[in-house]
Amino acid sequence: MDIRKVYLLILLCTFCILSPVYTQQSLSDEFRKVAGDYAALYTSKVEVGYSPYLYINHPYWDTDEFKKGAVCYGGLVYTDLQLRYDTFKKQLIVITPEKRILLQVDMRKVDYFIIGDKKFVPHNDTFAAILYDSPQMRLTQYVQCKMGTPVEKGRISYRQFEKPARFVLSKDGVDHTV
């Protein structure tokens, strides 16, 4: 009698535990099928955006729209991506293939990225756009985005981002902030 109860308990546990594991595996396989070789990019945090009801502007480089680009991630180049760069959080944002989820790319593994016609390279703790590059010198631009003073508009207080641009001229391995 006790053996039957133990046997039934083992069967019950087997079905209860293995069923969800099998389901998770099929979801993982489906994700890899859709993402393909680009799955490595889609393994980080979901982006928490900026509500237009709270902020009067955005902290993204140039525009808050996604632009076609490429990322050199862990030594591999991934092309035909929709990207935007958040200068406040210093995060590259990528949109998944089905265009439903916005994800932050793990910046520790990013060697460089290209958005539109601008190439971004590491500069201290952020990324800078290359404006001019030659064997003699390089001119880059980066943005030190910070939270500015609140703005009142129609009796409603909004927060705003200040995005002062900084330019760096590099010559003979020495950086000069312009």
Which stretches of residues belong to each language-model region?
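Generic detection of intrinsically disordered/low-complexity segments and helix-coil linkers/edges
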Residues: M1, L9, Q25, R32, ...
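Bacterial Sec-dependent N-terminal signal peptides
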Residues: M1-L27
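Hydrophobic alpha-helical segments, principally membrane-spanning helices and signal/leader peptides
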Residues: R4, Y42, I101-L102
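Hydrophobic transmembrane signal anchors and adjacent membrane-proximal interface regions, especially
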Residues: L18, V46-V48, P52, I156, ...
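General N-terminal leader/first-domain-start detector
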Residues: Y22-D80
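Aromatic-patch recognition
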Residues: G69-V178
